[in-house]
A protein has these predicted regions:
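Conserved class I S-adenosyl-L-methionine
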Residues: 54-63
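Conserved SAM-binding motif I beta-strand of class I
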Residues: 77-82
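A conserved beta-strand element that flanks and buttresses the S-adenosyl-L-methionine
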Residues: 124
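Conserved beta-strand signature within the Rossmann-like core of class I S-adenosyl-L-methionine
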Residues: 152-160
Length: 175
């Protein structure tokens, strides 16, 4: 797993967005605050009808915690897992500063969520699948998510790259 890579990224990040590698692929510049707010608002909008005070949310690949900081106040529990211990330590500090008592953090990769011994109403993965090793890993993660979802819960995979456009995207970045 790429734990060391993400620990180094998080350890050297100067702000919340860079913790998770949130930089423009074309110029390596950080995304603007407006772009980041729009990204978080989009995820919130997609989950709006499922957000209740009793909701139990799991974010797989919590990264910088941008989404968590917005959604956690709207639910009963907000759990997040990430392979980077440094990311989780930084998020824990942010949560304590904001007196967020419902945030739970776990040092697991996406295929290790079965270690979290509870069910969720919402499972969210945003800008994570592009880091998966392939289809089989994705299948395993989907199976694990289904096992963790409670009753009529929802699993949201957001901000997914279009695989059919991978080669043209890669070429455009190199130009």
């Amino acid at each position: 797993k790429d734990r060391l890579l993400w620990d180094v990224q998080a350890d050297h990040a100067e702000n919340q967005a860079v913790i998770s590698g949130w930089c423009n692929s074309y110029n390596n510049q950080e995304f603007s605050n407006e772009e980041l707010k729009e990204y978080v608002a989009n995820s919130r909008h997609k989950l709006e009808s499922y957000l209740t005070p009793d909701a139990r949310i799991l974010e797989v690949g919590i990264g910088s915690g941008m989404i968590a900081m917005q959604l956690a106040p709207c639910c009963k529990t907000y759990s997040g897992c990430d392979i980077s211990k440094i990311v989780l330590d930084k998020l824990d500090g942010m949560a304590k500063e904001r007196k967020m008592n419902n945030l739970r953090l776990y040092p697991y990769a996406a295929d290790e969520i079965y270690h979290i011994q509870e069910k969720f109403d919402i499972i969210l993965m945003s800008s994570v699948t592009e880091y998966f090793s392939g289809y089989n890993y994705l299948r395993k993660v989907i199976e694990r998510c289904i096992e963790q979802i409670d009753g009529k819960g929802v699993i949201l995979f957001a901000d997914i790259f279009d695989l059919d456009k991978k080669d043209s995207y890669r070429q455009s970045v190199y130009q």
